[in-house]
């Protein structure tokens, strides 16, 4: 991750957009019989995405990792060097009876990252930081592409959406020190500048989607 440190009182404003609900979504009746489902997203540094989706009601687990590459293995050193074409990704295990795939997509596009940036997110540059959706089922691919088309037609963003929609191939969990990074390192400079503002914006915009506080 690139370290963009706050200078003086300057802080990076987190990306956020108010966008419409997906018109097309997966019927929960068709998925609940299978139990939990998985969604795999890539949108810049995976630390903040993981922390954000862990707070969504109906999400059971989130892991950071790597998807979408050309090699049958992945680790941070190889991925960050651009040698495998994997993207920093998160794997979300969720209960479709509590949160739909379309709802996860809306959060991903509106607060999770800026989907108009090509092969980067802010200070983080390279294919490993691209915007991508790795559909684990044909239904997910259909819903994701339909939502992108809907957002484009409604001109929800000032620029074209750069998000790639690909069939899921594999997910390689990231190293242990990358798991729950924001929770374990709240004072890390990158977290302070980029991830905590994103979390605050998410909590404000989606207060009705948060897990109950224990």
Curated annotation (Swiss-Prot):
It catalyses: L-methionyl-[protein] + [thioredoxin]-disulfide + H2O = L-methionyl-(S)-S-oxide-[protein] + [thioredoxin]-dithiol; [thioredoxin]-disulfide + L-methionine + H2O = L-methionine (S)-S-oxide + [thioredoxin]-dithiol. Keywords: Oxidoreductase. SUPFAM superfamilies: Peptide methionine sulfoxide reductase. InterPro entries: Met_Sox_Rdtase_MsrA_dom, Met_Sox_Rdtase_MsrA_sf. It holds the Pfam family PMSR. GO terms for biological process: protein modification process. The active site is at 45. Its EC number is 1.8.4.11. It is an enzyme of class 1 (oxidoreductase). The keyword Ribonucleoprotein does not apply. GO terms for molecular function: L-methionine:thioredoxin-disulfide S-oxidoreductase activity; peptide-methionine (S)-S-oxide reductase activity. It comes from the Bacteria. PANTHER family: PEPTIDE METHIONINE SULFOXIDE REDUCTASE, PEPTIDE METHIONINE SULFOXIDE REDUCTASE MSRA 2. Belongs to the MsrA Met sulfoxide reductase family. Has an important function as a repair enzyme for proteins that have been inactivated by oxidation. Catalyzes the reversible oxidation-reduction of methionine sulfoxide in proteins to methionine. This is Peptide methionine sulfoxide reductase MsrA 2. The lineage of its organism: Bacteria, Bacillati, Cyanobacteriota, Cyanophyceae, Synechococcales.
């Amino acid at each position: 991750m690139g370290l963009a440190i706050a200078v003086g009182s300057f802080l990076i404003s987190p990306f956020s957009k108010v966008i419409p609900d997906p018109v097309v979504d997966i019927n929960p009746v068709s998925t609940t019989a299978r139990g939990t489902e998985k969604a795999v997203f890539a949108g810049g540094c995976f630390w903040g995405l993981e922390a954000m989706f862990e707070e969504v009601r109906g999400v059971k687990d989130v892991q950071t990792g790597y998807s979408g590459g050309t090699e049958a293995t992945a680790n941070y050193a190889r991925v960050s060097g651009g040698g495998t074409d994997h993207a920093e990704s998160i794997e979300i295990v969720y209960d479709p009876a509590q949160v739909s795939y379309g709802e996860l997509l809306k959060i991903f596009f509106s607060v999770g990252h800026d989907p108009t940036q090509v092969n980067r997110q802010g200070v983080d540059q390279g294919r490993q930081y691209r915007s991508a959706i790795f559909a684990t089922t044909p239904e997910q691919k259909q819903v994701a592409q339909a939502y992108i088309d809907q957002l484009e037609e409604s001109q929800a963003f000032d620029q074209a959406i750069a998000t790639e929609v690909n069939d899921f191939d594999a997910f390689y969990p990231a190293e242990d020190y990358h798991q729950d990074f924001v929770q374990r390192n709240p004072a890390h400079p990158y977290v302070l500048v980029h991830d905590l503002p994103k979390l605050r914006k998410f909590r404000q915009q989606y207060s009705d989607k948060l897990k109950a506080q224990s």
